[in-house]
């Protein structure tokens, strides 16, 4: 494991982008894998932050695409210094306006992807590596129209 990487999900905007900005200054990192659905925004990150950036377009609510990312991690066999699980979303609406598919997708991204990526990455993490899971205050402050979130 000569290569050291960071993986940032939900990297195309907001907090994810800010994590990429900070990590791009880390001299010990060989690559920063930026994972999100929007290919154009991922390419913009590569243009803005340089050659360390490896854009990976995946929808992590999809189990097949999560497994594809797992295969990439296994194939690379790099030391993972940081896993930043930042991807997530919520649809704010009345519960009866939320489809079963939308509910399952939200659960898959906000919960299943976080658990899966942690399990995929741990075998490649050394002592001193970090997993950062970005979550919501919604569990402490429930709000109307955020039933699944």
Residue ranges with predicted function:
Residues 24-44:
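Conserved glycine-rich Rossmann-like NAD(P)H-binding loop of the short-chain dehydrogenase/reductase
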Residues 49-64:
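Rossmann-fold cofactor-recognition segment
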Residues 86-91:
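Conserved NAD(P)H cofactor-binding loop of Rossmann-fold oxidoreductase domains
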Residues 94-95, 102-107:
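Substrate-binding pocket helix/loop in short-chain dehydrogenase/reductase
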Residues 118-119:
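A short, exposed helix-loop element centered on a Lys and neighboring polar residues
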Residues 12-13:
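Conserved glycine-rich cofactor-binding loop
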Residues 136:
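Residue(s) in the substrate-gating loop at a strand-loop-helix junction
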């Amino acid at each position: 494991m000569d290569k050291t990487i960071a993986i940032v999900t939900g990297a195309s905007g907001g907090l994810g982008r800010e994590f990429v900005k900070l990590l791009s200054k880390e001299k010990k990192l060989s690559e920063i894998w930026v994972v999100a659905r929007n290919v154009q925004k991922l390419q913009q990150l590569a243009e803005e932050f340089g050659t360390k950036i490896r854009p990976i377009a995946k929808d992590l609510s999809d189990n097949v695409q999560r497994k594809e990312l797992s295969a990439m991690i296994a194939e690379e066999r790099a030391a993972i210094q940081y896993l930043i699980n930042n991807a997530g979303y919520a649809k704010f609406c009345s519960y009866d306006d939320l489809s079963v598919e939308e509910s399952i997708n939200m659960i898959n991204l906000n919960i299943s992807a976080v658990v899966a990526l942690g399990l995929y990455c741990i075998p490649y993490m050394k002592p001193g590596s970090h997993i950062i899971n970005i979550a919501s205050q919604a569990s402490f402050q429930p709000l109307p129209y955020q039933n699944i979130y």
